[in-house]
């Protein structure tokens, strides 16, 4: 709440309360958000998320932009092996992921859509601040 108090007419602080208040708990088991927000470490490592940069998660490492083009990495079989694994029953986001996941809201939406709980319809009202907002 203190952070929000720094907002003024020229600067807005937007706290993601819905994300913070979940305390890292997830209603979904699969990670569908990784292809929408893939991450690159400071050393060039490409992985589904920052939590997986650690060497102990090397099975999720997709490539390194210091060794091959990003385009080649995301068009590779390895990319889809990792993405398909994250969306499979062999991966459980509830027990295998850290808290404050960047893909959390995307995962909530896509999981609801996949289960039929969320229907896609033409947007109504004021457009979001950015086309990628879910």
Regions found by a protein language model. Name each.
Residues 18-40:
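Structured beta-strand/loop patches that form or line metal/cofactor-binding pockets in enzymes
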Residues 8, 24, 31-34, 59, ...:
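A broad, low-specificity signal for short, low-complexity segments enriched in glycine/proline
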Residues 26, 45-134:
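Flexible mid-to-C-terminal extensions adjoining Fe-S/redox cofactors in radical SAM and related proteins
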Residues 1-20, 39-43:
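Conserved C-terminal portion of the radical SAM core fold
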Residues 3, 33-34, 49, 63:
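Small-side-chain structural scaffolding
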Residues 8, 36, 78-82:
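Generic structural signal for secondary-structure transition and capping sites
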